[in-house]
């Protein structure tokens, strides 16, 4: 029997016009948007799905990084997420957003993925303006148009 996340993922794939996408054996589904933004969906349980935006590896050579990340996380928390977290296996910074499955639709999922993408864009720009660059071979700061952002953006 398919989980609610699996059924939603099938409808989402149909809505955006791609073939089939599915969760792997670890209950993750990853894909790229515009070959820049890497998103992972986690079939966490039957109550909610997690949406992760993979931002990149932690820079180890910048002393202001931890303070900027804490400041960013506070701002995201004040605006309802997504939240910054660390994935130890990949040594990467992620943006994480909990997506409740009650009354979920492909449109709502797409909107929340867009929230994560917009938040990734803005996080990159704010960190870039502070002289901090996350190591991410896919996201190029020059491809993001408005580089004069001074505040974090939750996309909602």
Curated annotation (Swiss-Prot):
SUPFAM superfamilies associated with the record: Type III secretory system chaperone-like
Outcome of mutating residue 83 to E: Abolishes Tir binding
Main location group: cytoplasm
Keyword Chaperone in annotation: yes
Keywords: Chaperone, Cytoplasm, Virulence
Protein localization: Cytoplasm
Alphabetized InterPro entries for the sequence: Tir_chaperone
Impact when changing residue 67 to E: Abolishes Tir binding
Mutation effect (residue 126 to E): Abolishes Tir binding
GO biological process: protein secretion by the type III secretion system
Pfam families, A to Z: CesT
Record keyword Magnesium present: no
GO cellular component: cytoplasm
Function: Chaperone for the type III secretion of Tir. Probably stabilizes the protein, prevents inappropriate protein-proteininteractions and aids in secretion.
Subunit structure: Homodimer.
Similarity field: Belongs to the CesT/SycH chaperone family.
Protein name: Tir chaperone
Organism field: Escherichia coli O157:H7
């Amino acid at each position: 029997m398919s989980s609610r996340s699996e059924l939603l993922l099938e409808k989402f794939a149909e809505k955006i016009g791609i073939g089939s996408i599915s969760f792997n054996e670890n209950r993750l589904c990853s894909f790229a948007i515009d070959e820049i933004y890497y998103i992972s969906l986690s079939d966490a349980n039957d109550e909610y799905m997690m949406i992760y935006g993979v931002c990149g590896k932690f820079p180890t050579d910048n002393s202001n990084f931890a303070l900027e990340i804490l400041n960013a996380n506070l701002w995201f928390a004040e605006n309802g997420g997504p939240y910054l977290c660390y994935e130890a296996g990949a040594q990467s910074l992620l943006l994480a957003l909990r997506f409740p499955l009650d009354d979920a639709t492909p449109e709502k999922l797409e909107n929340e993925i867009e929230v994560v993408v917009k938040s990734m864009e803005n996080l990159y720009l704010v960190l870039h303006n502070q002289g901090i660059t996350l190591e991410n071979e896919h996201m190029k700061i020059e491809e993001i148009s408005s580089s004069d952002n001074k505040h974090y953006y939750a996309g909602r």
